[in-house]
Amino acid sequence: MPTVEESALRKQMAAGELSGLFVVAGEEKYMVGRLSKQLIKKAAGGTFPEFNNQAFTNESSLEAIGDASQALPFFAERKCVSVSDFDVESKSADELNKLYELWELCPETTVLVFWYPTLDFDGKRSSKWKKFLKQAEERGAVVLCGRRSRTELLRFLAREAEKSGCVLPRPSGERLLDYAGEDLTALKSEMDKLCAYALATGQGQPPEITREMVEDMVPKSTETTVFLLANALVAGDYEKAYGLLDVLFYQNEEPIAILGALGASYVDMYRVRAALESGHPYQDAAQYGDYKGRDFRLRNAQKNVRSISQGVLRQSLHLLLEADLALKGSRLEARIILDELIAKLLLAAQEDRV
């Protein structure tokens, strides 16, 4: 069975049609964890879980995993053997051959689940991972949980609010995404906090999560703070720009990470400006980068480029490159380099208005 959609796996679970091997991985770790736990619970059943639900990790021996796989279920139709974060790169060729043989010999009464709640891998570049996925597709199903689109994230947040007995208006959801980012684990945590506050204050029936609550209670992610910094730079807002840089250093963010995120914001603006000047909508810039589930970056860039020329954007990218080289090769303190960069970017934006 080839790579399947999450929805297809849910249908299999609902129908009780579980057998063979499943590999559950992907960028969206919240969904990897939730889907895998549901799969493991369904495959193991509720009978004698201490025998029929056996969990292993990357540190477990292949012999132990193999023995568990070969053992018959205890007073049940099937059992589940799960392995979390099995790192193919850390295994020898002999070990991997043993793994694939283990898959081949696994009895029909055992459901094997290899799931990746924390480990990321590149299945296209690494020959080991490429073979791992190919072998898995030949013997079972591979489910990759990708990043959600902004619309899907808004629906997720609305459902979580409803489960808790609250209402999340779309503007509040939009603001939450802008501030907390698009990682579902982080969003779920912030949503739980907002719902608890809304229920405690009892504003409305059911309680509504307002934009003011989001503004006051949700800490801004590094990416969001850098977006706001880019906005301030383009607007020529000296005080706000340096204030946001202070916030980033106060949060102990790595200077190279700050510069990287700021550079990404300027690249977004450059791409959007190029699309608009070519007579295309700003959304066309998405074809030049990975913007799936991150289209808000292009919307943010589109607002900024109204007041800045392509020439200034090119100059700004050159300044960012100089700062990057200075951070990596200069003896100057990182704060001094970034302070100087902010001044130069503000000056470039100001000259565009003269």
Regions found by a protein language model. Give the residues of each.
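Conserved beta/loop motifs at nucleotide-recognition and modification sites
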Residues: 1-354
